[in-house]
Amino acid sequence: MNRTRFFAALAVLLAAPALGAQQQYGRDSDTWRWDGRVDAGRWMNVFNVNGTVDFAPSTDNMVHLVAEKHSNGRPMDDIHYEVVQAGGNVTICAIWNNGSRCEDGGTASLHRNGNNDNHSSVKITVQVPRGLRVGAHSVNGGVSVRDVGAEVRANTVNGGVSVRNASGPVRATSVNGTVNVNTAAGPVTAETVNGNVDARMASLQGNDDMSFKTVNGSVSIYVPARFDANFRFDTVHGGINSDFPMTLSGRWGPRHASGTIGNGGRDLRASSVNGSIELRSQ
């Protein structure tokens, strides 16, 4: 590539962020609202940095989001919101600095460039129709999804994750916090580092694998009585208990359990270092 073409291409790349900049909302307001319609089966994703994200059902088949800033004594006008609508999905991000931007869906939607020196928080509550897929994401703050979610993705770093009465598959993760999931239809994947994992499924769809992990905490898994899987459980300092037949090895130190339930099929993995593992029938 000659120098002229190289610098022309570089200019396009440097201009791309400006061309794709999103409109900013709520800089001058302590409370910001967004109301809109998202069709059943589409994703409603919300990303926060400091603060909670809570989903609950709406009563009018619309989406209603309320974001409330809470100051630590410093100005909050650098905190704003961006909305991305693409392919029928909606992503809303709380933005703390001008080097960040919101993108369409997925866990990479919020790119944080530079340091977040404003330690104020934003509380985000969202009411959605029950048939939506929902994503609740934060960094420093708990996330919860209650009575909604044809599919749920919920994650944070510092805080608990709670998913109650979802109607479809769930992926829930934390680092410092407990993870509790209850859904009418799995599969479920749930992980943390410091905290317990509790996952309950009234039924299962498809044949996707499931994984449950923690380091400092226990893992409890509740599945239907008619359940098929190939499983492996591993713990270092803890016991293994099951309502289903299993082969247990290692009386002292690391303990392992593996086997087949029913006709096998999906892989079920659970592990802890400092905690017990239990598989229960419900």
What do these predicted regions represent?
Residues 1-282:
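Intrinsically disordered, low-complexity terminal regions
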